[in-house]
Amino acid sequence: MQKLKQQVFDANMDLPRYGLVTFTWGNVSAIDRERGLVVIKPSGVAYETMKVDDMVVVDMDGKVVEGRYRPSSDTATHLALYQRYPSLGGVVHTHSTHATAWAQAGMAIPALGTTHADYFFGDIPCTRALSEEEVQGEYELNTGKVIIETLGEVEPLHTPGIVVYQHGPFAWGKDAHDAVHNAVVMEEVAKMAWIARGINPALNPIDDYLMNKHFMRKHGPNAYYGQK
């Protein structure tokens, strides 16, 4: 597990590097599906002092199997996503400013241009509000459930992120690095959408044919963007 712990540590350290977190407001995890184990950031440990061996290993029930700290308080959300979506290898949660602003507004991040379409096939959805019972019950698990409910039958790697109503963004990917990459992009397109809507409040979404072209040239069966 040491290699995966290093990957998760590096991915967590990318959060302050890319300006996605303040203090300890964020966490990254990754899964070893063969072993059924997840590596995740410890709860409340400052990035400035965090080390590789501080990463916590949990099983799919959230039981700690390795590590001296408690795992992230959002662990149950991460586990719910891994259990529902076999294609996910990494999950990240932040409170990055612009993506969180859309979450607090209770609005999806609209697909307005090609930067968005290069990564997200359509709007980045916003979940419904959790009920008082859901919050007072198994809050973090119910957060995972409302994400799953909102995504429905969408392929999660085609919509690799979401904003949870009045909470903040979650993103995911093939591995921890990919999840952080998508979280960075989500914050950037959230900022772009906010600026663009300020310039032109009547702005229309990106045309479907342009969105399809940009997404499929990177992610479709005949993708040709980048190097093989």
Curated annotation (Swiss-Prot):
Substrate binds at G26, N27, S43, G44, S72, S73. InterPro entries: Aldolase_class_II_sugar_metab, Aldolase_II/adducin_N, Aldolase_II/adducin_N_sf, UlaF. It catalyses: L-ribulose 5-phosphate = D-xylulose 5-phosphate. One of its GO terms (biological process) is pentose catabolic process. Binds 1 zinc ion per subunit. The keyword Isomerase applies. SUPFAM superfamilies: AraD/HMP-PK domain-like. Its cofactor is Zn(2+). Pathway: Cofactor degradation; L-ascorbate degradation; D-xylulose 5-phosphate from L-ascorbate: step 4/4. Keywords: Carbohydrate metabolism, Isomerase, Metal-binding, Zinc. HAMAP family: UlaF. Belongs to the aldolase class II family. AraD/FucA subfamily. Catalyzes the isomerization of L-ribulose 5-phosphate to D-xylulose 5-phosphate. Is involved in the anaerobic L-ascorbate utilization. PANTHER family: FUCULOSE PHOSPHATE ALDOLASE (PTHR22789), L-RIBULOSE-5-PHOSPHATE 4-EPIMERASE ULAF (PTHR22789:SF9). This is L-ribulose-5-phosphate 4-epimerase UlaF. It comes from Salmonella agona (strain SL483).
